[in-house]
Curated annotation (Swiss-Prot):
Binding site for Zn(2+): H177, H179, D190
Organism: Rubrobacter xylanophilus (strain DSM 9941 / JCM 11954 / NBRC 16129 / PRD-1)
Name of this protein: UPF0758 protein Rxyl_1530
A GO molecular-function descriptor: metal ion binding
PANTHER family registered for this protein in UniProt: DNA REPAIR PROTEIN RADC, UPF0758 PROTEIN YEES-RELATED
Amino acid sequence: MGRRYTIKQLPPELRPRERLLAGGASALSDAELLGVLFGIGSREKTAVELAGDVISGAGGLHNLFGASVHELKQVKGIGEAKACILLAALELARRLSVARNPGRPVISSPADVDGLLRGRIANLDREHFVVVLLNTKNEVIEAPTISVGTLSSSLVHPREVFKPAIRASAASVVLAHNHPSGRVEPSREDREVTGRVAEAGGIIGIEVLDHVIVGEGYFSMKEHGML
């Protein structure tokens, strides 16, 4: 089947780029904004239609954070170039958010950890293990993702947890990960990984303050006497 039409064949008032120029970026839908970034579509669909497929396939715009090139390429019409454009845009959005709030957040409770990470990992469909690096004032230095996938000792090695902590001269860390099911009770693997990492932290002098599981609510292993 040949391509039905291109964006250039639309009336000017319906073209995303022209609408952006006339009314500003806020006048465009999510799919139109992403379509502008894509620039061109595929043989079967316009850039905006492809963008809509990407967003709906992810279950919403917020779920695109944490997506991989491989996952994005599962959408028909999305190749490596468009996947990279999207991931670059998402990373720029994340960095802009950090730049607009230069004050470092302080972690003083599990609720603070939940507030820091909920928007980033709560709705992802795979487990993302994050280590929150803290300075001596319990201010967040950074919070890198260490692994993606079901939490296990083979995936989360203490070496990988403390490598960024040592590099950043962190005084302590908080472990965190999401449960895609929404249930926040820790599994046996969660407890085993936490114990191994905490033991290693004691040896090298970087304390593991807590392990917080994010889902429908949150669970603090520290508060429940598991750490």
